[in-house]
């Protein structure tokens, strides 16, 4: 495993490598990606207070819905949501009562600062929508385009305060992220590899390695969408700062042969075989035809319990909704984050492996983490103009 100390410290900037981001108008056919919220134990409550964060408070202790997209969007659909009623809480873990004063267990619940979040929601409701020019797209989304930042064996969500405790992760966004990062740090140390600069969030995924050489393969494009997954957006609310989310299952270890869900696919500027023109020797990885390269899409939940920024297993505070709405246990509908990730890899006979499953050498353990931190007014503006009005916006939050 790579030495975790080779990444940047939280108080030092590092240079980032160049990146090519797929632009609007790129035709990418829809790809079905099956994800489930990951259950990972062993995290601790934050060791630092998030006083600098406008929302974050102190710790007190499936099948995804999908985006509706079109060929004009550089993103791909993650599948069709179920029409059945949303389920209740995704697991049986019970949240404590706010202000109970009970000692915080490891991997505990982190309460949202209700006063700060209500202030943000009030400002969101009072905000007027901007006029919409003609010719604007109708995909209800805004986005951030991010470059690779650094690689560390850290995870401030699952293993906060424990440097080197995680498998290797590749980080984009906030440059200061390490095992000790808190919500307050994200607002204090705001240097980022993402555009817009008002997105101070941190995003990370397990590092991809070439099986033949054991060399890491880093992302060449990392677009983060915030979008509506449903036909209507009238009940959407802005995301609270400090929200932690995980999508995918780091413990899943099954083959990913041609046609399997939850695998890497081949994409480029035009039609082509998503499964590649050939497969690796173990069949788990595509070999892309020219000029296609590896891509992966990961869909996060769009329903929140309205109380907690994190939970013991990092999934009980969020849930997937559908066209019938959010489950009663998670009544607050928020924009759904989608990772649209591009790699320079084209595939080899030896194949690849993820840091989350180096022995299995399949893609099934792919997962992603999001530690949300935006300028509150910038978040409100984008949710109101782009998602609520169901209009497509660029990195700067303008209609396009």
Model-derived features: where do they sit?
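N-terminal export/membrane-targeting signals
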Residues: 1, 25-28, 36-40
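Terminal targeting segments of Actinobacterial cell-envelope proteins
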Residues: 1-19
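A ubiquitous, low-specificity "background" feature that marks scattered single residues
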Residues: 13-14, 38, 52, 173, ...
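Sec-dependent N-terminal signal peptides
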Residues: 17-29
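Compositionally biased, intrinsically disordered low-complexity segments
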Residues: 29-32, 58, 145
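N-terminal low-complexity, Pro/Thr-rich disordered segments
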Residues: 34-134, 393, 400
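Primary mode marks residue(s) on the alpha4-beta5-alpha5 output face of response regulator receiver
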Residues: 94-166, 170-298, 305-400
